[in-house]
Each structure stands twice: as structure tokens, then as C-alpha cells.
């Protein structure tokens, strides 16, 4: 045999050659190959380097559990790191690059880490870098973080499209192997709505690499004919290249379809990936079983692979992974592989069986070594020999590949996503799905059923029962005849091999070896969840699909208990990695949504503004000046200037709604929880709008400009939502009211003039008297400007705590008025300021935004309980606001927070803990909603929502951020840090 590609075997199309590159080297594959099979066909054993020790790694599996063959595929914005070569279909022009090596895959300087392996055992980072402590953030952590990771994500924008879809069915079949195909066919013929999903490119699963015959057909032909019949049924949808990744409440399943991941240039009218949310009446988990690796010295060497993988490459892809392989087995499947290799012309050197006798009658040419184990391997970048221990001695046998068959573990991850725990079966030597799963059944290999005929029969029987439960007539289930079936699996768990000299790996991707597990148990981390985190076993991108059960078995062996007593870690979505693009769907970029710019955008840009995106709006964030090195310097200057002189801020982005009609006042009285019916003309009032459930929806001011005309402002982010809410109330709840609504946000340019000198500046362009006596706080009216040349609306409201006004003028005049105000205030120190400064000013004054109004807050939580009108017969949210849970004394309440040491700071999102309390969920007292450095106070200040906070002013607490590793002693206080008597508002 001159090539690793066999002359006749496999499902690949030998008439369609495909060119691809690996690390820049040109290679050839065939239509139907995966990248992994094409690399093996080219004799490429070394495909990657391990995470920690940078050991040479080869292809281990033929499917989704692959921990070693992770590559980067594509270029530019389409470059995708950590792609499993075993799942990546080959296409013309595919470019793949190995990862986690420098300067090259063959010569990786990182392999020197192997010399340091005695110091890099389990939990080494907890023990090694204790002193000197100051070097942790400056040296140790940066070095570890740079060394961590595998592939590198692209910095370029993703050019492709993604989408989301919903689907509903009577029966969702997950897995299109023999069990899944039989189930889907039975239910489909009965008329049930069926969705069949499978992560492979072809339906069939293990049938595609099986040499058995079913009803006289080759297994692969049976799979093809069955899938063709399913596709012809109008009530059946077959989704290939689709991975079901999660099981959620309501029997909703998440799945991601790789629509165009198998082509070089995706068609522009199709998504690259599609996220499916499938609502199933019933679901059948037919995902099969994953072969279990064996833990022996050098089991990670390139050329060592799972027996099932070797069988797949042989029978499905027509590739012999080696010319002189050996097989190390604990069950009968190793003999099936040996027979198929020999039938393909491959010389099997030896079968090493850990048992005294096999369950099948093997009559091949390979040497049988019973009651023996492989205790080690030899070779550099590929395996060259195995060390076999038997009869009290160790023998070296030359090989160029080794298949290991350590038993099977049912793939039951999805069955455990809703809290169920796997159950250990001593009979099956495997963990099984929990019983009594509502809405989900498990069958076939996923239920530890063995034998092809048994899996086909079980799939059909389960589907028949589900169909009858749905009330549909079910025709008699056809009994298929299976010939040349694989031998019965006789499980004999072999957790570890005695006499190991080289590293024996449990978790291949994270370089967790046998000694790491033993060390964790000896050091007290014997609970499976602790051992997982201490060793990082099961925490790589494969989430322990191959390593978890071996790790549990080794922990059980070290503790002298059964795997049932050790238990398992918690299974959570996602089953395999899911791209952010698929989760985001079409919500990327701007699409047809407009970029919204305020009427003062160009004016702000002319004055050097730095902009920030707020929804669709671009808001001026701050205005840097020459010599200022950081944004904070600019913001502090602007804050101090507003407090000392005056500032001009663009607030045009606030939502503006005009409400008119003879019932406008009554309408507002019903949508706000506080009173608006008797608001005088010429006055503004702060209002709280509730949802039906009693929680605050939005806040803002509404001014009565005329008897039946009101001017409402909303928050920027909720402007559209508030408009929709008001229209719903007017059209559905109270259609009898005479009220009209108009969104006028874009018709007005609005600017805030704040600071002690605001009045003298504004008076220069406003014709009317705006003294405190003539125009007091919360006054509102239409005014004339420049001797009647222009009219606008003036509101005496303040978000800064200073004497302040908001002036609204027709949008087209915005820039001219802003220039006029700067000119009028040039002798008074006026400066433009942005939203960052506005945020500091409002935190100093204790004003809230949607950081505090987070959807779970009621008026009393913010200290606005007395605002709620008790005398009104009704308003939106009134009934639900009176619920017991919303009036409890220990609800979160708005407080201020200051650090005990003014030199320390804390972040928004940090948790509040009682002094001396441990950082646990039970001890969580609340969290920081907004924080900023206050030039007025001289330290960081914050607003927070804290349990029973108003009665805890003066209490010392700990502000803790586990994400950043920060703990700051602090004190709770009044949320109003500036002018608590409001004297500056009323000057």
C-alpha cells in the first residue's frame, strides 16, 4: 500500500479531488472528506500542540468530541479558531492553520514547558506564585494569560449573515444514527410532524462506518435510502449539519445549523449559520455513545486514536490511519476493527486485550495478547512502538498507529440540562440518563443499548409508543434483518494502567494527566466539582466529553468507592461551542436602522466631541482639550466648570412626545403613578410610569404648556417603547378618551444650560423675564428669543443639581442657538459638556437612570413611595404594586456608597456584602448600580440598591467584585452627595 488512501473503500467521491492547505503546505483530498480524514490520507499525523506542555498531538476521534485536532480555518473576518478538524468538511481552497505553537508546528519552543512539568501540576498557579505578591498583577498573571488560549480570534468584522428560526413538531429526534432513523421513519409514516437533527453532514451516524448489512443492504445504503424516504415526506424535516446544544423549559431545544460552513465563499442570500429554537411535543435522544479512551503512558502520542475513529476513517473515508497498527481493547469491538482492517489489506500487528478471554471468535492474522495492557508508547512526533505488559514482563512492539477501545459512555448531556443527574450503572459500566424525563426519552446507544439490531428495534418501538400517545394510528413496525453485526460489547472498565512511566493523559486538551487527579484527591479536592476546577479536567473546549468519566473513575479508585458515590459534574448548555454570530442572528450591524444624529451633532463634532453610541443615537460623551491625556481629565474639568460657572449639554436625544386633547390630563393621570390631573399650566412635573406588574417602566418630566397640551420627555433608550405603550393605552385600554399622541423627538433641538451662571447667560437671548420670581423651579412655557425672531420652549429643570434650564428650539436652529449661547457665556466661563459629565453630575445629586430602574424596582425602592398617588381611582400598575412582595421592608433600596479610603475605588456591578461576610449568594446584600469619581467629594462615589438600605446609612460594608478580584471597604450613606437641601436649584 503506497498511500494512506485505500483504493476502493469509503463514501468519498474519488472523481472530485479537492485542493487545500495546512500550515501553507498544499495537499489533496476528496469530496466527502473531513479535514481530519484528508490530513490522515496525506500521512499527516502531527496536527497540533497541547495546551500546557505543548506536546505533539494527533487526531484522536472522528467526531464532535475531538480534543486535539483544533485548527484555525479561513482568513480575515472569516477566520475561525478552534475548529475541530474532525467536523470541518473539506472544500476546494480550504486554508487551515495549526494553533498554539511557535515558531512552527514541527518545532515548538513551548515544548520546553515539558521540562518544567514537575512544577506545573494540578493547581500550580495557586502554589507557585505566592511571593512576592506585588508581582502577581505585574508579571505572573499577564504571563499566564498570554500563554493561555489556543487559537486567536480575528480582529476583523465578520462579513457573514446569520439568522434565527422557530420550529414546532410532535416529535424531535436528536441523532440520525440507526436508532434515530428508525424512530423518525416510524413516526413519519404514522403522519406525525417530525424533525430529525444530526450534527453530521449525512444522516446515518455509525451506519456510515459500519460493514453490517440491513435487509440485504449495506448499512450506509440503508441510511441513504431511509433518509431519502424521510425527505420525501411533507410532515418530516431533516436537518443535517445541525447540533442540538441545549434542552430548556417548555420542551424547547436549541440547535445550530451550519448552513454554509462547508463552502469557501458563502452565498450572500443565505446565512452561514442558523439558530433553531424547536418546540417539541416529545423528544427522543438518539445521540449514541462516545468511546472511552484508555489511560496509559504516552496515550497522547500522534497515531494513537479511538478504535471507533479508526473504523470511521477506514470505512467511511477510505483512509488507513496506519500501515502496521495495533489495537488495545477492553471489549469486543476491538476485534471487529481488526477484521475490517485486515479485510482492507492493513496488517494488524497485535490485539492487546485486558481480559482473559474475548466474547467473539477471532480468526484473523493479528497476534493476540490476552490479560495484557499497553503501558507506554514510543516515538517523537508520531508513535513508533508500544510497550505491552503481560505475564509479568514488558515487551516492545513496533507499530505506526494504535487504536484504543475502552468501552462506551452514552451521550446524555442534553438529558441533564434541566437539573437531572446521570445514574451510574455497574452492569453497563457507564453513566445513564436520569429516569422520568418529562418530554424527553432516551434510546439506542444513548441508553447503553448494544447491537445494531437492538438499536434499530428500540428506536422504532419508542417512536411507535410516542405516536400512539399522540393519538395517531401507527402502522405495524417493520422488523429489519441485520447480518454481519458487530460483536456484543463486553464492558470491563480499566481506569488506569499499572507501571506507567510517561504521562498518562485523562484530559487531552488541558493536559491533565493521571498524577494530577491523584494529587487533587490527596490534597483534599476529592469532590468531583472541586477536582474538576483544581485540575481543569473537563474545562476545555470539548467540555470533558472524553475525559469526564475516566476522571470520575480515577477519583473513585483513589477514594476506594464506586463511581456512583463520586457522582458527576453539572451538564450545562452548550453541548458543543456555538458561535456568537448564531446566537446574535440578524442583529448585527445597522441593517436598515438609521444612525440617529442630534441636530447638534455637527456642532459637537466641531467642538471636538468624542461620541458614544446610545442605541441608534450618537451622543457627545466628552469634549477633550489640548494637554488632557485621559478622558477622566476632560470629564473632571467639565464637572468642575458646571459647578463653578456654566455648561452647555446636548439633550436632544431624550424622547419627546406631545399629548393633546380634552382628556390629555386624565390620560396622563392614568399612565403615571403620581398625580397629573391638576398640574397647572406653565408647570413641569417629574413622573414615574409603571408597567402592569407594578415595576417602574420609565421616568421623565411632563410639562403643561396649555390647558390641553402637554410636552413629555422620556429616557433616550425607552422613547420608542414609551410611545408604543401610550398608544396601546389610548387605543386599547381607554379608547373613549379624547387624546392624541405625536412623537416630536426629531422636531426639536434641546440643550441643557446648567451652572450658577446659567441664568445670566440665558437671559441674554431669552426675551421674557426668567428670574427666580418670574420663572421658578419646574416652570415651563413657550418663550421668544432675540426679540421675537424665534420661539422655543423653556423648562426650568435640572439633572445636575445646579441652577439649570432646558431650551428646546426647532431642530434647524439648534446649531445657531448653541453658538449664540457659547457667545453669550464666553465671559462667564461656559463650556460644552457631554454625557459622561452628565452622569457624574447626576450621581452626585442622587438622580436615577435605567441603571437603577432595572425592571425589578418600584417607586418606594428609590425613595419615591410618597409620589404614588393614593387618591387616584386607578393607574397602570396600581393593583400589582400592592402585592406583598413589593412592599416588604427588606426590598433593595437606593443608597449612596463611598470608600473608607478615598484613594480606593469600585466598579458598577460590584456586590455589597456585610462587613466580615463571606462572598456567597446568601450574603449578597445588593449591588452597585452606578459609580464615578466625584471631584466634589474627592473620591469615587456610587449609587447602589441594598437590602433595607435606607435604614443602614453609616454602616460599613464590603464592595466586592469577584470578576475583577477586588474588595473595597466602604460606607453606606445618603444617595444625595451634593446640595442635599436643594439650595442651588432655587437661586
UniProtKB/Swiss-Prot annotation:
Compartment annotation: Cytoplasm
Any single biological process term in GO: tetrahydrofolate metabolic process
Gene Ontology cellular component annotations, sorted alphabetically: cytoplasm
MF-aspect GO terms: nucleotide binding; sarcosine oxidase activity
Entry EC number(s): 1.5.3.24
Cited function: In the presence of tetrahydrofolate, catalyzes the oxidative demethylation of sarcosine to yield glycine, 5,10-methylenetetrahydrofolate and hydrogen peroxide. In the absence of tetrahydrofolate, catalyzes the oxidative demethylation of sarcosine to yield glycine, formaldehyde and hydrogen peroxide.
Entry cofactors: NAD(+)
Binding site for (6R)-5,10-methylene-5,6,7,8-tetrahydrofolate: 714, 806
Record note on quaternary structure: Heterotetramer composed of subunits alpha (SoxA), beta (SoxB), gamma (SoxG) and delta (SoxD).
Source species, domain of life: Bacteria
InterPro entries: 2Fe-2S-bd_N, FAD/NAD-bd_sf, FAD/NAD-binding_dom, GCST_C, GCV_T_N, GcvT/YgfZ/DmdA, GcvT/YgfZ_C, Sarcosine_oxidase_asu
Binding-site list for NAD(+): 198-199, 206, 244, 445
Free-text remark on how the cofactor is bound: Binds 1 NAD(+) per subunit.
PANTHER family to which the protein is assigned, alphabetical: AMINOMETHYLTRANSFERASE, AMINOMETHYLTRANSFERASE, MITOCHONDRIAL
Family: Belongs to the GcvT family.
Catalytic activity as recorded in UniProt: sarcosine + (6S)-5,6,7,8-tetrahydrofolate + O2 = (6R)-5,10-methylene-5,6,7,8-tetrahydrofolate + glycine + H2O2; sarcosine + O2 + H2O = formaldehyde + glycine + H2O2
Pfam families to which the protein is assigned, alphabetical: Fer2_4, GCV_T, GCV_T_C, Pyr_redox_2, SO_alpha_A3
The protein's name: Sarcosine oxidase subunit alpha
Lineage: Bacteria, Pseudomonadati, Pseudomonadota, Alphaproteobacteria, Hyphomicrobiales
Keywords attached to this entry: Cytoplasm, NAD, Nucleotide-binding, Oxidoreductase
